[in-house]
Amino acid sequence: MEDVQGRADTRQIEINKVGIKDIRHPVRVRDRTGRDQHTVATFSMYVNLPQHFKGTHMSRFVSILEGHDREVTVESFHEMLAEMTDRLEAHSGHIEMAFPYFVNKQAPVTGVESLMDYEVTFIGEIHGGRHETWVRVAVPITTLCPCSKEIAERGAHNQRSLVVVTALMDGFVWLEELIDLVEREGSCELYGLLKRPDEKHVTERAYDNPKFVEDVVRDIAGRLNDDGRIAAYSVTSENYESIHNHSAFALIEQDKRGR
């Protein structure tokens, strides 16, 4: 049978990324306790397509996923990137692997345990044989408005905020380390389960530690700047304002490699 996508294309336009998007597959991720978490990730896999090819081989992307013992690990994620560009005869490739990641947390006063889930994404890129691996963590926190605290006679408005850190690694970093870093720079961190003494503690903790959205990203950026294992990063914070029908947002980007 004729391979239609293998035909020549006469438009002379290269495609930057072509492939499959949002395919789910089992993955295994080792956490800081040394245990493996079995979860399901959503993959997006792309390669470049030279101008003289009509189409790419879409089935090969799925075949690469299926070839990893039906369960992808962090180690095989890096192998997949090289395999993908090799099998599809491309000089650049891009893989994203997004999955829920769970951390067991203790409430601050009673010590009651519960799970917190975080959205994690591994982003791998290869271009001309050069690899880069980025890790993205989305961490919810509580923020309390310094202005509201200053002007109000009783209380202050607070809200849940979402911080997203995307970091280029130049050394090994546990996911929990990035999560801990973010949570320490909020007005207060979140928990899956709180008893009344815990709720009192987190309410007072947030009140004693007010932060604007600008404070959050600057404090996190300062911590990332001090970590030699992180070569570049972006950090965003979105505050889901409790007294407005809009969000507050801030972004800092930094390439510590001097580019």
UniProtKB/Swiss-Prot annotation:
Keywords (A to Z) from UniProt: Hydrolase
Pfam families (alphabetical): GCHY-1
Gene Ontology annotations of biological process type: tetrahydrofolate biosynthetic process
Superkingdom of origin: Bacteria
Keyword Hydrolase: yes
Annotated positions for site May be catalytically important: C145
Pathway recorded for this protein: Cofactor biosynthesis; 7,8-dihydroneopterin triphosphate biosynthesis; 7,8-dihydroneopterin triphosphate from GTP: step 1/1
Database matches in InterPro entries: GTP_cyclohydrolase_FolE2 (IPR022838), GTP_cyclohydrolase_FolE2/MptA (IPR003801)
GO terms assigned for molecular function: GTP cyclohydrolase I activity
EC number(s) per entry: 3.5.4.16
Catalyzed reaction equations: GTP + H2O = 7,8-dihydroneopterin 3'-triphosphate + formate + H(+)
Assigned protein family: Belongs to the GTP cyclohydrolase IV family.
Known role: Converts GTP to 7,8-dihydroneopterin triphosphate.
UniProt-recorded name of the protein: GTP cyclohydrolase FolE2
